[in-house]
Swiss-Prot record:
GO terms for cellular component: membrane. Glycans are attached at N73, N236, N363, N376. InterPro entries: CD36_fam. Its main location: membrane. The keyword Membrane applies. Belongs to the CD36 family. This is Uncharacterized protein R07B1.3. Residues 1-8, 524-536 are cytoplasmic. GO terms for molecular function: scavenger receptor activity. Residues 30-502 are extracellular. The keyword Zinc-finger does not apply.
Length: 536
């Protein structure tokens, strides 16, 4: 009989320790890791009122967001106005702004399940981030949104103005020098604002008194509150309504989901006609996400700037600063209002204008079953376009009719792109909303948001200004926003979410392998010793 040596006992204990350690890592690491991840991601505050780290980062997004505005210069304004010609456009820009956000006046519900805040935004022009060759003082020719809005209100089918009042307005627009196209500097049209004679008259006391005297006081609601006009008028140092969001305290799967916006749990019927379209789904701007992403995930989010909710789906794998990501993008279907499921997002088209007569035409379309031209007694817009029904980010009506699309009508059929000169859609440059997220934590490391703002122009015989204009939708500008998290966030994700799990993943195999090697060595030695004793 061979006695058990001390070194064998010690070796066996070490092997058992390594094996159990490796097995414990195998079984327990991911449940513990996921529990810690959820715990650290929940939004909350300390007893002294200071925010937990995750809530602090949420309130002060650690990202550099460069927003570039590309405008469209109309090169043939006279031909469009007098001959009804196809607008010829040249894209100019981008003109860069640094956008920063800060959530203020935050508070938490007594049960810790909800967080309140106001999201303040600032925009600073950044010449160094401009595309080469462009200056903030560049002049462009663009559609006169204020005048077109006035024509739509006064001469549209829903107008309450008498024929005499319409004649006076038509003459008045000409006397004020209003023209379908105007030329201003980029800084004026984007942020600084310019004085428009129509706005000045509309806000004058005499005009308001006359309108009320003749019984058109209700029409004053259509006059924009702005005294000067700019696309981003009033947005600097402003906030986009009040939010209550889910902290994930009770249900981590609802982390960041908007519970109410502007005091509303669903959008008003004045925005969208169907209950489904009015739903507020997912987190604010998609800033928070579930963990452990898969290619089958559908991630909803609410974008107050566009007055609606979207979903994003898996697009492709990628790399951001050396970290593997899954890119989730808003798919084509979300912009297709010809689909019945998106019927609530359709443009009302009360003017009943067929803006794209070549689209879905029985003489040119091979399969009419693949497109829907009309609904509810009016013409539908082709896929890739939907209306902006609120003043972006606010529970208020827009100052004039605006349509939203991906840049260069990327998601629209060729008939839309060919209806204007200068449209060159590129999926790599113009895909509307892409979130590059780290798979395990769901952290958005890079976000690219792109959208185009378009103005519908109507040939209206009752208005001198637009009597010879074509029925056309003209792009005003598109925004190309590129947000990238700061280096310390990259480092935290790299170390805590990638390196540590990878080390544990390797270590558990190494420990189990070492334990097996030790036990195998002991067994071999034991067999040899036993064989030697037997021979003797």
């Amino acid at each position: 009989m061979v006695s058990i040596k001390r070194y064998e006992i010690i070796s066996f204990v070490i092997a058992a320790f390594f094996f159990l350690s490796g097995l414990s890592m195998w079984i327990a690491f991911w449940p513990i890791f996921n529990s810690e991840l959820r715990s650290n991601y929940k939004l909350g505050a300390n007893d002294d009122g200071s925010l937990h780290y995750a809530a602090f980062l949420y309130a002060n997004p650690p990202m550099k967001n460069v927003m570039k505005f590309n405008l469209f210069n109309v090169t043939n304004p006279d031909e469009v106005k007098y001959l009804g010609a196809k607008p010829e456009l040249i894209e100019v820009g981008g003109y860069a702004f640094l956008e920063s956000e800060q959530k203020k006046y935050y508070e938490f519900s007594s049960d810790k399940t909800k967080m309140f805040y106001q999201n303040y935004k600032q925009y600073h022009y950044s010449e160094v981030d401009n595309d080469a060759g462009y200056n903030y003082n560049d002049k462009i020719m663009f559609p006169n949104s204020i005048a077109e809005g006035a024509v739509s209100t006064v001469f549209g089918p829903q107008s309450e103005f008498s024929p005499t009042a319409k004649i006076l307005v038509s003459i008045g627009l000409v006397m004020l020098g209003e023209y379908p196209f105007i030329s201003k500097t980029v800084k004026d049209v984007l942020m600084d604002g310019y004085e428009d004679p129509l706005l000045s008259v509309a806000h004058s006391g005499i005009f308001i008194s006359l309108v009320n005297f003749y019984g058109y006081g209700s029409q004053l609601n259509y006059i924009p509150e702005m005294k000067t006009f700019a696309y981003l008028s009033g947005y600097n140092n402003s906030y986009d309504e009040n939010y209550w969001i889910n902290t994930g305290y009770n249900d981590f799967n609802k982390l960041g989901f908007v519970e109410s916006w502007a005091g509303l749990e669903q959008l008003p019927a004045s925005f969208w006609p169907t209950l489904e379209a009015r739903q507020i789904k997912g987190p604010d701007s998609g800033s928070l996400s579930k963990i452990h992403l898969t290619k089958t995930d559908e991630l909803p989010f609410f974008l107050s700037f566009m007055c609606r909710s979207f979903k994003r789906t898996y697009w492709q794998d990628g790399l951001v600063d050396g970290i593997k990501t899954m890119a989730f993008a808003v798919p084509y279907e979300e912009f297709d209002t010809t689909l019945e499921k998106n019927a609530g997002f359709r443009y009302k088209n009360q003017e009943n204008v067929d803006y794209f007569p070549d689209w879905c035409d029985k003489n040119t379309t091979t399969s009419l079953s693949q497109c829907q031209k009309t609904a509810n007694g009016t013409f539908l817009l082709p896929p890739g376009i939907f209306p902006l029904v609120c003043y972006p980010g606010h529970n208020a009506q827009p100052p004039f009719t605006v349509l939203v699309s991906p840049p260069h009508f990327l998601y629209s059929p060729p008939e839309v792109q060919h209806h204007l000169s200068g449209m060159n859609p590129d999926p790599e440059k113009h895909k509307p909303m892409v979130f590059h997220q780290e798979k395990t934590s769901g952290t958005a490391l890079q976000v690219d948001v792109r959208f185009q703002v378009n103005l519908p122009v109507v040939n209206n015989k009752g208005s001198i200004m637009s009597s010879q204009m074509p029925n056309v939708i003209i792009p005003l500008f598109y925004e190309d926003s590129h947000a990238l998290v700061k280096d310390f966030v990259m480092d935290t994700v790299w170390l805590g979410v990638i390196i540590v799990p990878r080390i544990i993943e390797y270590l558990k195999f190494v420990l189990i392998f070492i334990s097996i090697c030790i036990l195998t060595t002991l067994l071999v030695i034991r067999v040899r010793v036993k064989g030697t004793v037997s021979v003797v």
